Amino acid sequence: MIKRLVAFDFDGTLIDSPLPEYGKLVWSEKKGIPYPHSGWWSKPESLDIDVFDIKPNPVVYSQYLKEISTPNTYVIILTSRLKKLEEQIKLVLEQNNIFVNEINTKNTNETKGIRILKYLDKFPEINEISVFDDSIDVIENEYNTIKHLLPDNLSFNIYFVNNNKLTLVESKIIDIIRDELIKLI
């Protein structure tokens, strides 16, 4: 029975994927032709394992190893990458011996927060959700906005990944303790 959901963002969180400016330059040099697109994140070239040696962020990878070995835990990749790139994402993960229960790509306008909520229907016994992301914007505008929609008995932990460090920035348990302390004062 699944009791925990752990969601890792892909780019810049679990995986140290190439950034657009550098990536386009390297891709052009290795292929011997100009990079053919103006965009980056929605293009399969951005995850071309024949061009890039794409590795995981070590601290986040260590956390992944801990989470994937924890019983009753469903580990997912929760990315803003499009569904059409799912095969490239799988290849990068497999190349790094990363195997998750699910890759959740963006295929609608739903935020990551809304996509997380859907797992409560899929696994009604979940009592803990932990998310790992490198975007403060996503944390503030997509995860924090769903806290009030979560059951009271559910622990919701948000970790910010920056410079290969994990920082717990939000926890529903911390909020409950803070509220109770305020009531006592």
Regions found by a protein language model. Name each.
Residues 136-185:
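Asp-based, Mg2+/Mn2+-dependent phosphohydrolase catalytic module
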Residues 2-110:
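Alpha-helical substrate-recognition element adjacent to the catalytic core
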Residues 74, 128, 157:
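Residues at the starts of beta-strands that form the adenosine-phosphate
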Residues 4, 112-142:
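Conserved Lys-Pro-Asp/Glu-containing loop-to-beta segment of HAD-superfamily phosphomonoesterases
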Residues 13-14, 83, 135-137, 165:
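Solvent-exposed loop/turn segments at secondary-structure junctions
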Residues 108-114, 164-169:
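A short acidic, often aromatic-flanked loop/helix-cap motif at beta-alpha or helix-coil junctions
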Residues 91-98, 117-124, 143-153:
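Short, surface-exposed basic-aromatic patches at helix termini and helix-loop junctions that form
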